[in-house]
From Swiss-Prot:
Pfam families: FKBP_C. It comes from Arabidopsis thaliana (Mouse-ear cress). Residues 1-26 are annotated as: Disordered. Its main location: cytoplasm. This is Peptidyl-prolyl cis-trans isomerase FKBP12.
Length: 112
């Protein structure tokens, strides 16, 4: 499957290019194999927007490939197969089981 993108709200700004830094709000779903269960959000108390460099492998493959086509202001849900998320190891600290499909709701805040 890779990554599937569903636009929730279109953006109106530029799209990031490989090597640029994007700042996003993100909420991840798929705790304990249940895509309705949140495991993490930058909107939770004590959290802040997350920044990463596109195409450098600093984040899961689903983010690198899914966010590159998004515009500033866009909100989209990315469904990532396990090989585009945390794979066979999962992410036990967040309750992500091995080989889990995950959903991420991402809002692009800025591109630099």
């Amino acid at each position: 499957m890779g990554v599937e993108k569903q636009v929730i709200r279109p953006g109106n700004g530029p799209k990031p290019a490989p090597g640029q830094t994007v700042t996003v709000h993100c909420t991840g779903f798929g705790k304990d194999g249940d895509l309705s269960q949140k495991f993490w959000s930058t909107k939770d108390e004590g959290q802040k927007p997350f920044s990463f460099q596109i195409g450098k492998g600093a984040v899961i493959k689903g983010w690198d490939e899914g966010v590159i086509g998004m515009q500033i202001g866009e909100v989209a849900r990315l469904r990532c197969s396990s090989d585009y998320a945390y794979g066979a190891g999962g992410f036990p600290a967040w309750g992500i089981q091995p080989n889990s499909v995950l959903d991420f709701e991402i809002e692009v805040l800025s591109v630099q």
